[in-house]
């Protein structure tokens, strides 16, 4: 019942500080790779963002916001720009289904969702 206990006691950490040990990150990726995947397509990708990448992500978020809502005020843009800097690491999950004759896109999206969770 250890797995059930782990799921039932899981909570999100509101603020993270310090670097994430490489071994923990490797364990997380290895666990994600155990998601059900009928044809071993691995229809997901992980992008680890740290350091300068966090600043670049903030700028990208601002650019996307301005493209969608050009009238966004400066204070909101500044807050958005700084958001990725609140954590020492961001793991971006990307669903990337590929055409397959036996595995429909919806199944690949479900696999990605399980892996990313």
Regions found by a protein language model. Give the residues of each.
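Short beta-strand element of the conserved SAM-dependent methyltransferase core
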Residues: 16, 93-94
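N-terminal amphipathic, basic helical "cap/leader" segment at the start of enzyme domains
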Residues: 1-87
């Amino acid at each position: 019942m250890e797995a059930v206990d782990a799921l039932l006691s899981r909570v999100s950490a509101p603020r993270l500080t310090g670097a994430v040990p490489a071994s923990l990150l490797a364990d997380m990726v290895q666990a994600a790779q155990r998601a059900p995947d009928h044809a071993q397509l691995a229809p997901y990708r992980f992008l680890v963002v740290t350091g300068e990448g966090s600043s670049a992500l903030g700028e990208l978020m601002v650019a996307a916001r301005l493209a969608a809502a050009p009238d966004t005020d400066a204070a909101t843009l500044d807050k958005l720009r700084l958001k990725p800097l609140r954590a020492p690491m961001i793991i971006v999950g990307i669903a990337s289904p590929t055409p397959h004759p036996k595995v429909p896109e919806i199944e690949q999206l479900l696999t990605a969702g399980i892996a990313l969770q």
